[in-house]
Regions:
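S-adenosyl-L-methionine
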Residues: 1
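Conserved acidic residues
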Residues: 5
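Amphipathic alpha-helical repeat scaffolds
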Residues: 9-13
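Mobile active-site "lid"/loop adjacent to the S-adenosyl-L-methionine
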Residues: 14-52
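Sequence-level detector for compositionally biased, low-complexity segments
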Residues: 21, 28, 46, 62-566
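Conserved phosphate-coordination/catalytic loops
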Residues: 50-58, 117
C-alpha cells in the first residue's frame, strides 16, 4: 500500500474586482502565475488569456503541481466556464496531458449573458450565482504518460435547484452505474464540447492582425473592438448636456485629486466616490501627475446597443480602450460603414449588425468586433495641417481614406465572379452571408470560438444574390428610423397624448403570458396589431422591438447615480 494524496475544495470563482473603485486588486503570485504562463497560457490559441489567471484556474494549477509524479486525486466544484471557452483551450489540453482520468459533472446554471429560452434551458443554479457550475474529479496515476480518458455527464435541461440536488444525491459517487458517462474525444484545438468544423478552417478568415500583408484575409488588419469606456454610467447618456456636465465634473474632480496628491494633502484617492470611475488607466495617469483638460474633450453619437444610440464622452484619458476606432471614425464627419460581429465565447447565438457610427464594445455579446469598409490613414496629418491653417477647414482633410476590404479577396472574387466586382459588392456579400441561416447553423460552434470565415459561393449569380441581399439588409438596419411604418399597426390614445415613457410593457393574454402584438407605451398610448413575425429578426439575443423597449426607458445608474432618460 502507498499513500494517496487527495486535494478537494471549492475555489473562489472570481477573477477579482469589478472596477478600480472596489479597491480589491487581484493577488499576484509570481511562481504560480509563471507556471500558468508556461502551461495553460502557452498552449492556448486565444489572444486574451486573462481568464487563465482566475482564482479557480490557479487552484487547479497549484493542486496539480502538489500531486507531482506520485499522482493522486483532485476534486473541485468550480465555475464551469473552462469547459468550452476558447481562452481555456490550453487549460483543457494540459489537463488531458497531466492526468489519467477526468470526470466532469456539468451542473449547468450558466445564465449570465444568456437571454430567453437559452437562459431557461440552463435551469436554476445550485448556488445563488449566475455562473455555471461543474464538479471535476481528476485522477493521476504514478508515472502515467498516456492522455487522459475524459468522462462527461450533463445534468440536463430546465431543471430546478431541488431537482438538481436530488439527482446529485441519487448518484452519490462517480462510480454509480446510474451515471451515463459520455467519453469525450477532444480535437487538435482543445475542444471538448461543441467541436468546431474542419470545413470552416478552409475558408478565408475575416482578419488576422499578424498577417500584415493580407495574404489570405477578407479585411485588412484595421478591424477593431468596440469602444470600451469602463465607466458607462458616467460616459453615456441620451442627453448631450448631461454627458458634457458629467465630463466636466469628472475632469475637475480628477484634477483636484491630482493637485491634492501633488501637494501632499491627499495620500490616496477616494475609491468610494461617485464623482469619477477609477479605472486602471486613470489611476496610472494620476500617479504620473497627468493633467486632464475639458477643452480637449469630444462628444460623439454611438451605437450603444442594437438600435439604440447614445451620446458619449469621446476623450481618450476617460475611455479605457478605443482600440482601432480612431482609424475607422477619426472625426465626427467621418463617412464609413462597419460590419460588427459577436466576440468569442458569448452567451447568445452569433449575431452581426452594420453601423455607420462608433459602436460600444458590448453592443454585441462577448465584445463586438468591427470590420470596416474603409479606414483612415493619418500618417501625413502633420504635413496636411501645415497647408490647412485656415478657419473652418474640413477635419477630414487631415486623413487619407484607405480600403478595408483586402486586395487579396478582391482579386479572388474578380477571378471567380468577373471583373466588375467591387469592394463594396464584397462588403455587402459578407453581410449577406453572415445573415444566412444555413451558415449560422452549420458553423454555430465555430462562430463561438473563432472569428468568422467567408465561404465563396460557386457562381456569379449566387454571389450577386448574397451581395444584393446584404445591401438591402444594410439599408434597413442603418436607416431603421426613416423606413415606412408598417401599415397594419394601430396606435390608440386616451386623454391628452403624452409621449413620456418610464418603461414599455407587453400586453397580457393571461396572468403569465405576454401578448406581443400589443405594447403599452405608457398609460395614455397603446400600440396594437404588431405582427408576431416582427420578433423573428433577433440581434444579440433579442428582437429589434425588444431592444427598443429595454433601452428606451428611464434608468438611474447605480454606480454613478446619474439619470438617463431617453
Amino acid at each position: 500500500q502507498a499513500p494517496l494524496r487527495v486535494i478537494m475544495g471549492n475555489p473562489p470563482y472570481s477573477i477579482g474586482q469589478k472596477s478600480a473603485n472596489d479597491n480589491a486588486q487581484n493577488q499576484y503570485y509570481p511562481l504560480l502565475d509563471g507556471r500558468i504562463s508556461d502551461t495553460y497560457a502557452k498552449y492556448t490559441d486565444a489572444n486574451n488569456k486573462n481568464s487563465l489567471h482566475d482564482s479557480y484556474i490557479k487552484a487547479f494549477r497549484w493542486s496539480t503541481d502538489r500531486l507531482g509524479k506520485e499522482g493522486g486525486v483532485i476534486g473541485f466544484i468550480t465555475n464551469s466556464g473552462w469547459l468550452d471557452t476558447n481562452a481555456c483551450s490550453g487549460f483543457r489540453k494540459c489537463l488531458e496531458q497531466e492526468f489519467s482520468s477526468i470526470y466532469v459533472f456539468n451542473l449547468r446554471g450558466a445564465v449570465r449573458g444568456k437571454k430567453g429560452e437559452l437562459a431557461k434551458k440552463e435551469g436554476k443554479n445550485v448556488f445563488d450565482i449566475m455562473t455555471g457550475v461543474s464538479i471535476t474529479i481528476l485522477v493521476k496515476k504514478p508515472c502515467d504518460k498516456t492522455k487522459a480518458t475524459i468522462y462527461y455527464h450533463d445534468i440536463g435541461n430546465y431543471l430546478s435547484r431541488e431537482e438538481k440536488f436530488r439527482i446529485i444525491k441519487s448518484f452519490g459517487s462517480i462510480a454509480s452505474p446510474a451515471i451515463n458517462w459520455k467519453v469525450l474525444t477532444p480535437n487538435e484545438h482543445g475542444d471538448w464540447l461543441n467541436l468546431r468544423s474542419e470545413l470552416f478552417t478552409t475558408y478565408p478568415v475575416f482578419g488576422d492582425k499578424e498577417d500584415k500583408k493580407n495574404k489570405q484575409t477578407v479585411f485588412v488588419p484595421y478591424y477593431s473592438n468596440g469602444l470600451k469606456t469602463q465607466r458607462d454610467g458616467w460616459a453615456y447618456n441620451a442627453s448631450l448636456k448631461i454627458v458634457k456636465d458629467t465630463a466636466k465634473s469628472q475632469i475637475d474632480y480628477y484634477n483636484q485629486q491630482r493637485e491634492g496628491i501633488k501637494r501632499g494633502e491627499i495620500e490616496e484617492v477616494d475609491y468610494s466616490t461617485k464623482a469619477i470611475s477609477w479605472t486602471t488607466a486613470v489611476l496610472a495617469d494620476i500617479s504620473r501627475g497627468k493633467e486632464y483638460r475639458f477643452a480637449d474633450t469630444e462628444f460623439r453619437t454611438v451605437c450603444y446597443r442594437p438600435f439604440c444610440k447614445q451620446n458619449v464622452l469621446y476623450y481618450k484619458p476617460l475611455n479605457e480602450r478605443t482600440y482601432q476606432m480612431p482609424k475607422l471614425f477619426p472625426a465626427k464627419e467621418s463617412q464609413n460603414k462597419i460590419i460588427c460581429v459577436s466576440g468569442l465565447g458569448g452567451g447568445v447565438p452569433f449575431s452581426c449588425l452594420i453601423s455607420d457610427i462608433i459602436v460600444d464594445l458590448n453592443c454585441l455579446s462577448a465584445g463586438a468586433q468591427c470590420f470596416p469598409l474603409y479606414w483612415y490613414d493619418d500618417s501625413t496629418a502633420d504635413i496636411a495641417d501645415l497647408f490647412n491653417q485656415v478657419p473652418n477647414i474640413n477635419p477630414m482633410d487631415r486623413y487619407i481614406r484607405r480600403d478595408g476590404v483586402s486586395d487579396w479577396i478582391l482579386r479572388e472574387c474578380k477571378q471567380r465572379y468577373g471583373n466588375k466586382v467591387t469592394r463594396e459588392d464584397i462588403f455587402y456579400y459578407v453581410y449577406g452571408i453572415l445573415h444566412s441561416p444555413e451558415y449560422r447553423t452549420t458553423f454555430e460552434a465555430d462562430l463561438k470560438k473563432m472569428l468568422p470565415r467567408l465561404p465563396l459561393v460557386d457562381t456569379p449569380e449566387q454571389f450577386m444574390a448574397f451581395s444584393q441581399g446584404g445591401r438591402k439588409l444594410a439599408d434597413l438596419h442603418l436607416n431603421y428610423e426613416t423606413v415606412e411604418p408598417y401599415a397594419g399597426v394601430t396606435i390608440k390614445t386616451s386623454g391628452t397624448p403624452n409621449y413620456e415613457v418610464q418603461k414599455m410593457r407587453f400586453g397580457k393574454l393571461d396572468s403569465k403570458t405576454a401578448d406581443k402584438t400589443k405594447i403599452i407605451y405608457n398609460p395614455h398610448i397603446t400600440i396594437e396589431n404588431i405582427p408576431v413575425e416582427a420578433y423573428e429578426y433577433v440581434v444579440n439575443g433579442k428582437s429589434a422591438i425588444e431592444w427598443a423597449m429595454e433601452r428606451y426607458q428611464v434608468t438611474v445608474d447605480k454606480a454613478s447615480g446619474i439619470k438617463n432618460d431617453p
